[in-house]
Amino acid sequence: MNLIQRFMRVFFNLFYHPFAFTYDLVAATVSFGNWKDWVYSIIPFIEGTRILELGHGPGHLQRILLDRGLDSVAMDESAPMGTLAKRRLGSSHKLTRGLAQKIPFADEAFDSIVSTFPTEYIFDMQTLSEAHRVLRNSGRLIVLLAAWPKNPLLGWLFKVTGESPSDARELIKSKMKMAFARAEFKTEVQIVEVKSGSLLVVIGKKEESKC
């Protein structure tokens, strides 16, 4: 693990735990006010009615899914995030605390699993294996992995650094495809263009058992 990776791990640990109360403000700032819209953009990819969200954060997506009448449950490792989400959802919440590497639900329990802007746990083979286990045949694992805002400041920054969003996209797409394939998902990667930016969505489909 290099120095940058160590720094990011420490940063996210602080961000999701003692400083979880700053999540909405920070997310809105780095996305130029588009964070929630980006999160909601994953909804059209969801199939079925029994949904699991990995890493629910402060509960914005859960609120929408429950309001739409879906049987949605969610889990997050962070206790502070659970507190924020419970405040938002009230008595309607179906939240549990736990690790994505040890999903506490039965085999083939869900039609779709969603995760928006997850940290490195989503690349863990144990996470992907667990997701595969709890999905029904033809179920979907849908991950909103990254977003690139359409903002003049960022365009200038990419010119200065000599990098481009397309370089980052290809690197992330390659990494996710390899991870999903190892977990026996049929994988599709989409770049979703919205008014405020470009979103990278990875969809892993659990193919029907041949048995």
List PLM regions with ranges.
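Short alpha-helix
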Residues: 167-184
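A short SAM/SAH-binding and catalytic strip from SAM-dependent methyltransferases
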Residues: 112-125
